[in-house]
Amino acid sequence: MASHHPQKRLVGPLGRARGLGSAKSGLQHWWAQRVTAVALVPLTLWFVFSVVHLTGADQARVHDWLSRPASAILMSLFIVATFYHLALGVQVVVEDYVHREGVKLTSLLLVKGLIVLIAAAALFTVLRVAVGS
């Protein structure tokens, strides 16, 4: 006689995870966040040191400082690493806490678009100062 009670399935974590998609993009995202975090340590130290060193300086001195190739390159790297790290972090927050797909997609597009816009403006400013206006 057949039993009408459903059998318990003994499925471990690996079995439950199968079929949920690839974790490759998650791993790349995780690595990108770690790499930008490590890159930001010396860049942030350089930036803070520079700001402290330039405290009280007039606009001409700051302009002269940023027009030097080393300063312009380091500032550009700092901007790119900071805003890329920010975009990665915001993406995780939105994906984890916004549950409606339409709102999630809209939020990601708006926030990432704003981040790209601000980063591009900052890079344009550095470039404009570095090559002269």
Q: Which residues fall in each region the model found?
A:
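Membrane-embedded alpha-helical bundles that constitute the cytochrome b-like, heme-associated redox core
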Residues: 1-133
